[in-house]
Amino acid sequence: MAKRRSRGDGGLHWDEKRQRWIATANLGFDPSGKRIVKRGSGKTKTEAKNKLKEVLRDHEDGLAIAPTGYTVADAVNDWLAYGLAGRDQRTVENCTHLSQKHVIPGLGARKLRDLSAEDVDRWLAAKAQTLSTRSLQAVHSCLNRAVKRAMARDKVKRNVVELCSVPQGQPGRPSKALTFAQAEAVLNAAEGTSMHAYIVVALLTGARTEELRALTWDHVFLKGSPDVEPPQPPHIAVWRSVRRGGDTKTRKSRRTLALPARCVEVLWQHFEDQGWERLAAGDKWEEHGLVFSSAVGKPLDATNVRRAFRQALKDANGINADEWTPRELRHSFVSLLSDRGVPLEEISRLVGHSGTAVTEEVYRKQIRPVIQTGAVVMDGIFKRGPAR
């Protein structure tokens, strides 16, 4: 005779339709009076009872467990839809791109509750064969934040992604700078193009692309203030960027930069050209007061600038336009100043860095430091010329 199950052990029966054993446990009633029943299924009695034990353990841990079919893709899509509210549009687009191209294809079909640290390690190791370390960190961050959000909403008990370190990836695209001869070739090739003024100002002031795209005419002073004491030369006030809220990258990025004569000349011409564009556009013109805008006054995005920049460089001698980006004009600015012996502290101020350490780290390939203070002082002390 079969042994009778103890009170509270729940039930166990064969489901003919599903062809599985179903183990059930009655946990009382919820606040609305509805009976709370937990179930576990399996091909054998033991498997069904073990599955029920897992469900009961999760319930005792206080977890409102997600449906068993809840996948990594579900968690990532939920995070993209609701977890990025209030973020900059560029951030949302970047996270969406990384998630849809790398996270979901690799791990999306995996059930979230079954995702293990080993799964994540293998996925990262595979991605390390093609992605740079920085890109690996970005895709790991997307997955980590998605699972963390799912855990906060009781979809999973723990976040295994946090247990996984990011491996070393492939070397990223190295930064580079124009030589003086290349810079001259770029400036000459840009003449007569819509990007001429942009390229001249970017190369000769070192302003960031995000700062130039947000530059407005009321922050451009082409005549300066010669009558004040001390006199102010022509300058631009770099106080805004296209970042969310219009703030510059850091507090010290807010700076006022004197304009070289070549910049003043091209900006006067650009101001006149933009006036003709405004007349040609007529009612289609959108007035934003931007120095650098589309043919109808609209703000430029990074893709617009990069495409037009490469188009302007296509006839530059010794330059493969497809290998260069607008941000490398800033690298070139640093390199040209360093070649002329401008102190690192001064370069750091001009590019809007919070300190020289940042400049050395970001532009270490462009900086050519020669620490000569000690040699100069010692020469003055001992007054001995070089041996002949």
Curated annotation (Swiss-Prot):
SUPFAM superfamilies the UniProt entry points to: DNA breaking-rejoining enzymes
Molecular function per GO: DNA binding
GO biological process, one term: viral genome integration into host DNA
Family annotation (InterPro entries): CB (IPR044068), DNA_brk_join_enz (IPR011010), Integrase-like_cat_sf (IPR013762), Integrase_catalytic (IPR002104), Integrase_recombinase_N (IPR010998), Phage_Integrase (IPR050808)
Tagged with keyword Transmembrane helix: no
Domain Core-binding (CB): 70-151
Source species, domain of life: Bacteria
Residue positions of the active site: R208, K249, R330, H353, Y363
Domain Tyr recombinase: 173-379
Record key words, sorted: DNA integration, DNA recombination, DNA-binding, Plasmid, Viral genome integration, Virus entry into host cell
Job of this protein: Required for integration of pSAM2.
Family: Belongs to the 'phage' integrase family.
PANTHER family linked to this entry: PROPHAGE INTEGRASE, PROPHAGE INTEGRASE INTS-RELATED
Protein name (record): Integrase
Organism: Streptomyces ambofaciens
Upper lineage: Bacteria, Bacillati, Actinomycetota, Actinomycetes, Kitasatosporales
